[in-house]
């Protein structure tokens, strides 16, 4: 479906801008009018990570006049495998500041606005209100639903992308013309069911593939050219090198954009998405130990069985001495319980403590009352006990 241009054109392009954007200007569908609209556009990128990196770089190169960056994190060495807007010299720096420097290095004519804060229900409306279009580069469900609901309530379009291992998805959500994210995914998955990129990994170059698609869609919406991905979900399988599309219809019963919406103001999205389930939270109360406590138990020869509930490829990267591997899903399916000793105390751990808390809830309900898990997981262990080991 063709849509009208989102923004009005700027008054003019300078001589330098004409020279810079000449390859756009000779495209009939873009031309002077389209480039002036890009110059006048205000686009906010939520996140300067895997998707935000290529998105910001190409938005800047394309000549978007104002770019906002929402990012509160710092550059970590593990980011550099895919977050190409940052460099080795940026490790430890603010991601927002690092991204700004890269953007201005690409295009000094861009006005960059930094929002160095976590995007939350109490600031999202004020931040989003300053921009014409949002590019969602987030990697967690709570923020995705927050972005969606804020955009629906403000009647703003946004370009969404998602990546995991070798798979990517992208769409344009604009409730005035089509469905929103909740029409596609009315409810978040159960806590721990879908691994994050930090848990499951992602092919670095996949970020460029999906991020570039997001920028393409942003340009189309801003300039009013082509047929944006409104009402369509694009799915990319990098292993098979296949693209396919699925039609997404507006849900008349959608909680936020439907005929009788029940979400008319922003909610508690962490609670809505159940970042850690109530069962896991209850199980962890009084049954969480620190890496230092575990080290003391090991040194004292305590009668314990340390179980790593991560995936085999994670176990190969780094592990706690003496831990044996039983992936989380084997507990969720019930097949692992029969392998647990009845005469030893079970100590669970994962990468950070989220998955092990979910497994702890399963063990508690199965009668392993003295089972515990390690808060902070193997990452906490490395930081506190064996700093010479790698983290991921």
Segments and roles (model prediction):
Residues 4-12, 69-107:
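Glycine-rich phosphate-binding loop and adjoining beta1-alpha1-beta2 segment
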Residues 1-44, 77-78, 266-268, 272-282:
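N-terminal charged helix/coil linker that caps or initiates catalytic domains
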Residues 61-66, 366-369:
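Conserved S-adenosyl-L-methionine
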Residues 38, 127-132, 340-341:
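A short, aliphatic-rich alpha-helical micro-motif
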Residues 3-8, 238-252, 256-304, 312-347, ...:
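Rhodanese-like catalytic fold shared by cysteine-dependent sulfurtransferases
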Residues 2-6, 108-121, 125-213, 223-225, ...:
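E1/E1-like adenylate-forming module used to activate ubiquitin-like modifiers
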Residues 51-52, 355:
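Hydrophobic/small residue at the entry helix of a nucleotide-binding pocket
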Residues 46-47, 70, 349:
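Conserved N-terminal Rossmann-fold NAD(P)-binding element of oxidoreductases
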């Amino acid at each position: 479906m063709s849509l009208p241009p989102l923004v009005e054109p700027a008054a003019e392009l300078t001589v330098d801008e004409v020279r810079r954007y000449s390859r756009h200007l000779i495209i009939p569908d873009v031309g002077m009018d389209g480039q002036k609209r890009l110059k006048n556009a205000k686009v906010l990128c939520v996140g300067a990570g895997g998707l935000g990196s290529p998105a910001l770089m190409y938005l800047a190169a394309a000549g978007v006049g104002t770019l906002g960056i929402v990012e509160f994190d710092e550059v970590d060495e593990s980011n550099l495998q895919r977050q190409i807007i940052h460099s080795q010299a940026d490790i430890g720096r603010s991601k927002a500041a690092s991204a700004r420097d890269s953007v201005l290095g690409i295009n000094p004519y861009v006005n960059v606005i930094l929002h160095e804060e976590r995007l939350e229900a109490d600031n999202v409306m004020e931040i989003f209100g300053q921009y014409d279009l949002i590019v969602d580069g987030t990697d967690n469900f709570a923020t995705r639903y927050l972005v969606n609901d804020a955009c629906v309530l403000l009647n703003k379009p946004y370009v969404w992308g998602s990546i995991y291992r070798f798979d990517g998805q992208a769409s344009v959500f604009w409730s005035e013309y089509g469905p929103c994210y909740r029409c596609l995914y009315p409810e978040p998955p159960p806590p721990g069911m879908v691994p994050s990129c930090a848990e499951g990994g992602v092919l670095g170059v996949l970020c460029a593939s999906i991020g570039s698609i997001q920028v393409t869609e942003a340009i189309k919406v801003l300039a009013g050219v082509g047929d944006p991905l409104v009402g369509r979900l694009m799915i990319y399988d990098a292993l098979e090198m296949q693209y396919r599309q699925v039609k997404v219809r507006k849900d008349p019963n959608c909680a936020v954009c439907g005929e009788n919406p029940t979400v008319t103001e922003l909610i508690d999205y962490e609670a809505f998405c159940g970042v850690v389930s109530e069962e896991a939270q209850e199980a962890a109360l009084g049954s969480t130990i620190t890496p230092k406590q575990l080290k003391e138990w090991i040194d004292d020869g305590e009668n314990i069985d340390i179980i790593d509930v991560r995936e085999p490829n994670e176990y190969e990267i780094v592990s706690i001495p003496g831990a044996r591997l039983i992936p989380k899903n084997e507990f969720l399916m019930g097949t692992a319980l029969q392998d647990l000793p009845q005469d030893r105390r079970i100590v669970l751990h994962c990468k950070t403590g989220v998955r092990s808390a979910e497994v702890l809830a399963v063990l508690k309900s199965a009668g392993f009352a003295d089972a515990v898990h390690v808060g902070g997981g193997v990452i906490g262990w490395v930081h506190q006990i064996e700093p010479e080991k790698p983290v991921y």
